Amino acid sequence: MAGHSKWANIQHKKARQDAKRGKIFTRLIKEITVAARMGGGDPGANPRLRLALEKAAENNMPKDNVQRAIDKGTGNLEGVEYIGLRYEGYGIGGAALMVDCLTDNKTRTVADVRHAFTKNGGNLGTDGCVAFNFVHQGYLVFEPGVDEDELMEAALEAGAEDVVTNDDGSIEVITAPNDWAGVKSALEAAGYKSVDGDVTMRAQNETELSGDDAVKMQKLIDALEDLDDVQDVYTSAVLNLD
């Protein structure tokens, strides 16, 4: 991970998220509902639900909305049943893309995803065409200036798998997916507050894009993220947009 301007990418990512905040609640409600349906309504015994509730809290989702989503998932309230789908494909410069969806209409979703790829210079691929390049892991990013040795000691004590210092001075803590929320809570209790973090599918081999290619790739990612059925978009692309 070292060598990339992680800090600049975080600021760009946050600006895009703020612009799309209106869709965040809808996606969180879907995720909470599905997580509760698959693993039950107790976040202590359901890591996927616990992660979804962490995100809901970070985005100030009203507790009533959260509880209704859980109740729909556990069957206490009637609701739409969503299925999870994953699509794989290629973007600008052959950069890999994985698109996770929750939908009640598979035919609509695949048509929308294919259209977004085709219209924006990408290609929808076959199952498994890029998945081999991604690893499922959690990460937490801390701003430059944090004491690396002290953070590393606290992170490893909390159950993190690795700690990486990027060239721009930011520090990244890597966790197993199911350990992410626990490590985050433990570090916050120790006085370390992350500026970014999530459980994600991270590319092991990245594709750096700059200039027009980076702009085109961002447009493709935005088109996919704007689809109602899309929950997450993962890519091997590292965009140099400055």
UniProtKB/Swiss-Prot annotation:
What one GO molecular function would you report for this record? DNA binding
Q: What is its main location?
A: cytoplasm
Localization recorded for this chain is: Cytoplasm
Highest taxon in the source lineage: Bacteria
Q: Which UniProt keywords apply?
A: Cytoplasm, DNA-binding, Transcription, Transcription regulation
Q: Which residues form a coiled coil?
A: none
Which GO BP annotation is one of this protein's? regulation of DNA-templated transcription
**Among its keywords, does the record have Transcription regulation?**
yes
- Which SUPFAM superfamilies does UniProt cross-reference here? YebC-like (SSF75625)
Gene Ontology CC entries for this record: cytosol
Q: What PANTHER family has UniProt attached to this entry?
A: TRANSCRIPTIONAL REGULATORY PROTEIN YEBC-RELATED, TRANSLATIONAL ACTIVATOR OF CYTOCHROME C OXIDASE 1
Q: Which family does the record assign? A: Belongs to the TACO1 family.
Name the HAMAP family on file.
Transcrip_reg_TACO1
- Kindly provide the name given to this protein in its UniProt entry: Probable transcriptional regulatory protein NGK_1508
- Source species of the chain: Neisseria gonorrhoeae (strain NCCP11945)
